[in-house]
Amino acid sequence: MTKTVLLIGGDGFIGTHLKQKLTDQGHSVNVIDKKSNRDINNEYSFITDINFSHVVFLAAEANLRAVKQNPKEAIKTMTSGLMNSLINYPQAHFTYISSSMVYGNWDSDSVHEYSAKAPIDLYGQLKLAGEGIVRELHDHWTIIRPTAVYGSNDDPRRVMPFFIERARNNETLTVKGHSN
């Protein structure tokens, strides 16, 4: 069965890969992204003439340094942009791409859906708040909490591409954190 999918924030790392996969499977895919002059903080940016079966919300500032440098923009996109998206597509199944950052620094070898949420930075706090907004404002939803994602065409400023490039160049890797 062909789906009509809207990727909000679909020009980012995960979105470009997801768009390719969905298109390869024969689904109809549309994208809203600030990179293509459609800002979800502007109510006129939404596509309203298509009845989407699925909406995937990927919009976020994935670079933690950028979140710290411009928290106002991150907050706007990850809260009011999210609410605009939920309000504009009440009929669609809504998938919210959250983050494992909602758990903060966990002490066990693994976490699960019901593990304690204790975000340690603004990004994790905004993702956790987004989950609550989705649960409150939409009837049909899925929340996904990926861990560190990386792969081809990743932003070289992110940690995994940085580590991979250092390793390829046989350079020292410095990892800061707790040693327990």
Where are the language model's segments positioned?
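Adenosine-cofactor binding site in Rossmann-like domains, unifying the SAM/SAH pocket
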Residues: 29-47
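NAD(P)-dependent short-chain dehydrogenase/reductase
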Residues: 132-180
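Short alpha-helical oligomerization interface
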Residues: 64-81, 111-119
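Active-site helix of classical SDR
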Residues: 126
